[in-house]
């Protein structure tokens, strides 16, 4: 944005809200959300970022990933993919990766994630123009992420796979009414996310069914619900 940005606060919190327009594209507004590692409701930054994406429904997301710490950063990427919003991944600090004789297979990442992945160095302003072009393109043509099933459906993830799809079937009408992405809502409901459960407005019978489905998965996987979902994501990242 250069110097063309405004700083305010998100309603009800002291988290900065930075907005501006992209150079050469004055009609395009860009909002810089707080740096976070997940969409869990455990900090004001996470809640603000999640609410913005869910409520404002941006035309596209630029997900900036630290290429030197890719595993930790891709956890958030997977949650953003579940929101089914056009997205481009900016693989930042690629100059440091290459400087340390490292490498990242960008084409493989694009294939696995189902979205464009652009290597950049923000510090050196390398790849930024290409990133902006991709972001504007997917926003204009509403190119949503290719649908990915993060479960590998092996014996290890089979229980999680069945659980997620059973919960999707249970909540999909409620998710549509609440204007929530159903895959995201399903995984958060499994984790017991109180804010998402409140928005879904499930009746007691549906809550009981949800609990039964999740408990069955916990029994099969022999881990609790949050760990099962986290394991699914980390297993996918390790591919």
Language-model region placement:
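Canonical P-loop GTPase G-domain recognition
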Residues: 95-152
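Conserved C-terminal guanine-recognition region of P-loop GTPase G domains, centered on the G4
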Residues: 20-25, 48-118
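Helical mechanochemical/support elements of P-loop NTPase systems and associated helical scaffolds
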Residues: 11, 15-18, 29, 41, ...
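Catalytic cores of large soluble enzymes that bind and process phosphate-bearing ligands
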Residues: 7, 37, 41, 68, ...
């Amino acid at each position: 944005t250069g110097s063309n940005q405004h700083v305010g606060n998100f309603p009800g919190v002291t988290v900065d809200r930075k907005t501006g327009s992209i150079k050469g594209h004055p009609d395009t507004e860009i909002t810089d959300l707080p740096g976070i590692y997940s969409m869990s409701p455990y900090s004001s930054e996470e809640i603000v970022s999640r609410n913005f994406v869910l409520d404002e429904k941006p035309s596209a997301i630029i997900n900036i990933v630290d290429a030197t710490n890719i595993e930790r950063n891709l956890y958030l990427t997977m949650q953003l993919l579940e929101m089914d919003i056009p997205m481009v991944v900016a693989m930042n600090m690629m100059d440091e990766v290459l400087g340390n004789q490292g490498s990242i297979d960008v084409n493989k990442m694009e294939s696995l994630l189902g979205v464009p992945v652009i290597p950049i160095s923000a510090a050196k302003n390398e790849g930024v123009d290409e990133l902006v072009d991709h972001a504007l393109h997917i926003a204009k043509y509403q190119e949503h992420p290719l649908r990915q099933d993060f479960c590998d459906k092996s014996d290890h993830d089979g229980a999680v796979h069945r659980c997620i799809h059973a919960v999707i079937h249970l909540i999909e009408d409620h998710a549509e009414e609440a204007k929530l992405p159903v895959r995201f809502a399903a995984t958060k409901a499994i984790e017991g996310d109180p804010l998402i459960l409140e928005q879904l407005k499930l009746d007691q019978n549906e809550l009981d069914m949800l609990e039964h489905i999740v408990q069955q998965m916990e029994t099969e996987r022999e881990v609790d619900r949050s760990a099962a979902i986290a394991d699914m994501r980390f297993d996918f990242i390790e591919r």
